[in-house]
A protein has these predicted regions:
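N-terminal FAD cofactor-binding segment of flavoenzymes
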Residues: 27-65
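FAD-dinucleotide binding site
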Residues: 8, 35-37, 51-52, 61-62, ...
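A short, basic/flexible loop-to-alpha-helix module at the beginning of a structural domain
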Residues: 1-10
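Short, solvent-exposed loop/turn segments at secondary-structure junctions
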Residues: 20, 43-44, 110
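Feature captures the FAD/FMN-dependent oxidoreductase FAD-binding
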Residues: 78-128
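Glycine-rich active-site loop/strand segments that organize a redox cofactor
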Residues: 50-92
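N-terminal Rossmann-like FAD-binding beta1-loop-alpha1 element of flavoenzymes
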Residues: 10-38
């Protein structure tokens, strides 16, 4: 691998921008790691909360428990938050922790193959 490729290759690839992906990205930032990329197959963040927009879609866990411990939300409008409010919270986290520049939207992972000899992963997207 030449130096120019190595310098632009992320040291961490996070698949998806649901709660798990966003949390990992924020924790990497908190640890001082900036060489990460989130690959998101859709055009926006949110995972299940982006995809499930049916009437009445809501959390089945009390809202005050449904936020990151390091970014609590105390002003939920309901005991069990509705999908739009949860998605807004996730977007708030993307903005507050400046993650947008690390996200590649419309970029679906096709495969991830580990090479034991080099201790590296090769991640391929549907676009190549």
């Amino acid at each position: 691998m030449n130096e120019s490729v190595r310098s632009t290759t992320p040291s961490v690839i996070i698949i998806g921008t649901g709660f798990g992906g966003l949390c990992m990205a924020i924790q990497l930032r908190n640890a001082g790691i900036e060489t990460f990329t989130l690959l998101e197959k859709a055009s926006g963040v949110g995972g299940t909360w982006r995809d499930n927009t049916y009437p009445g879609a809501a959390c089945d866990v009390q809202s005050h428990l449904y936020s990151f411990s390091f970014e609590p939300k105390h002003d939920w409008s309901r005991k069990f938050g509705l999908q739009p409010e949860i998605l807004d919270y996730m977007q708030h986290c993307v903005e507050k922790y400046d993650l947008a520049g690390h996200i590649q939207f419309n970029n679906e992972v096709a495969s991830a193959v580990f090479n034991e000899a080099t201790n590296t992963w090769t991640v391929t997207t549907t676009d190549g």
